[in-house]
Amino acid sequence: MAGTTQGAKTLYDKLWDDHLVSQRDDGSCLIYIDRHLLHEVTSPQAFEGLQLAGRQPWRLNANIATPDHNVPTSKKEREQGIAGIEDDTSRIQVQTLDDNCKTFNIVEFGINDIRQGIVHVVGPEQGLTLPGMTVVCGDSHTATHGAFGCLAHGIGTSEVEHVLATQCLIQKKSKNMLIRVDGQLGKGVTPKDVVLAIIGKIGTAGGTGYAIEFGGQVFRDMSIEGRMTVCNMAIEAGARVGMVAVDDKTIEYVQSRHYAPKGEQWDQAVAYWNTLHSDDDAVFDEVVVLNGAEIEPQVSWGTSPEMVIPVSQAVPTLEQAKDDVQRNDWTRAYQYMGLTAGQALADIQLDRVFIGSCTNSRIEDIRAAAEVVKGRKVASSIKQAMIVPGSGLVKQQAEQEGLDQVFLEAGFEWREPGCSMCLAMNSDKLQPGEHCASTSNRNFEGRQGNGGRTHLVSPAMAAAAAIAGHFVDVRSF
C-alpha cells in the first residue's frame, strides 16, 4: 500500500502499516482502530454527538467501558452503587456512562461489577488488549497497552466520537525512538524507577514527536506488569506512544484471558504476534541508552516528572540547572513544594502515602509493597496511607493471598478499585501543603488536590516511606 514503510521496519512501522487505511499527500493518514476503551469522563459528549447525528457505533464489540476516574474508593460509598456517590458531578458522570452503555448496547463493567477497575488495568486483565492491536481511549495514559506490542495512545473527546462512529482515526505518523536499557537492575530497583530515570534523563519533552520503543536486556527481563508501568509513563516523557516488543512473556500473559482468542484462532494469532518486533537492521531516528546497573530508586522532588533524583541525592541547587528556563522552573518548584535547594530527601516530612493508579496498582505492585510493610507499622506522623487496587479482580486476588491483612495490620487503608488519589476528581484528595509519596504518574501543581505536593515513587519506596514517615532507601530498609 502507498505510504507503508519500505525495507527494514521498526515495531512501530509494522503496527502502523498493518492498520493504515489510506494516506493523503499532506501526510495525514486514516488508521483503523481495533480496541476502544471508554470511561465516564471523556465519553459523555461523544455519546451525545452520536445521538444528535442519529448514528450507532460502527463495531460494537470493539468498545468496552468501565467507570474509574470519579468512582469513590471507600467501602461506605461503594456499597450503595451509583446512588451512594456523594459528589453530584461524579455521580452524574458515572450514571451517564451507565445510561449511554445501555442505550448503545456497549459492554460495561459497572461500579459494583467484580471486573470494574481502572481502564488500563482492566483491558489487559480481561484480554481485551492483545498484541498487534491499535488501542485508544480518552485518557493520556493509554500508552500503557503498548507493553503488549500494541500501538496505543490517548485521544480527545471529539476523537472518541469519531472512533465510535467510524472505527478509524486521522493521524500523522511519528518518528521512531529507541530507549535501550542495558545490563541488569540492582536490588530494590523497579520498573517505576527505570521510567522515572528515563524521564529524568531525556526530560518531559524528550519524546515529543516520537513513538518510543523500550528495548534492551532490562526490558527483556522485566515482567509484563513492569512493562505496563514503563509504557504508562511514555506520555510523561513527551511521547503519545510507548511500546515493548512481543516475546514469550507477552503471549503467556495473554493466554487464557477471557477475551483472548481460543483454539485455531489462538494459533493463528500467536504466529502473527511472533513477528511483532523491530527488524534487526531497522533504523531509529533517535536512540537513547541507559545502563540498568546505574539506576537507583527514584524520588521526584518538584512539580514535573523530570524533576526526579536518585534517593541517595539531595534536592538540586540552582547552580546545577542547565539554563535560565530550568532555573526559573526549579525556583517555582522550590516554592510550591516548600523545599530548599540542597535539602536531603529524608528531611521531607510526609503526610500521606498513596499506592495505586494505572501506573502501579496491579498485583505485582501490591505484593512489592506488602513485602516491605509486613510486620511493621505506619509511622504515627503519617495522616493516611492507602492501598487502592487497580480492579476488583486485583483486589480479590490480593485478598486471597492475605495481602489486605498485611496492610490493615500495619495501619493502611484497604480501598475499593478506582483512580483514587492519582487526580483530584473524586473524594480522595490532598489538602493544601500536604506532602504525599505517590505511585501515580504526575506531580503537577494541584494534581492530587489544591496545594497538594506530590512525590512520585515506586510501590516499594512508598511503602517504606509510610513506615518511616519520610523517604528512605528501600535497598537498606
UniProtKB/Swiss-Prot annotation:
InterPro entries: 3-IsopropMal_deHydase_lsu, Acnase/IPM_dHydase_lsu_aba_1/3, Acoase/IPM_deHydtase_lsu_aba, Aconitase_4Fe-4S_BS, Aconitase_4Fe-4S_dom, IPM_dehydratase_rel_enz, IPMI_cat. Its cofactor is [4Fe-4S] cluster. One of its GO terms (molecular function) is 4 iron, 4 sulfur cluster binding. It catalyses: (2R,3S)-3-isopropylmalate = (2S)-2-isopropylmalate. Signal peptide: none annotated. Pfam families: Aconitase (PF00330). Binds 1 [4Fe-4S] cluster per subunit. Keywords: 4Fe-4S, Amino-acid biosynthesis, Branched-chain amino acid biosynthesis, Iron, Iron-sulfur, Leucine biosynthesis, Lyase, Metal-binding. The keyword Iron-sulfur applies. Its EC number is 4.2.1.33. SUPFAM superfamilies: Aconitase iron-sulfur domain (SSF53732). [4Fe-4S] cluster binds at C358, C419, C422. Pathway: Amino-acid biosynthesis; L-leucine biosynthesis; L-leucine from 3-methyl-2-oxobutanoate: step 2/4. GO terms for biological process: L-leucine biosynthetic process. CDD domains: IPMI. PROSITE patterns: ACONITASE_1 (PS00450), ACONITASE_2 (PS01244). It is an enzyme of class 4 (lyase). Belongs to the aconitase/IPM isomerase family. LeuC type 1 subfamily. Catalyzes the isomerization between 2-isopropylmalate and 3-isopropylmalate, via the formation of 2-isopropylmaleate. Heterodimer of LeuC and LeuD. This is 3-isopropylmalate dehydratase large subunit. It comes from Acinetobacter baylyi (strain ATCC 33305 / BD413 / ADP1). The lineage of its organism: Bacteria, Pseudomonadati, Pseudomonadota, Gammaproteobacteria, Moraxellales.
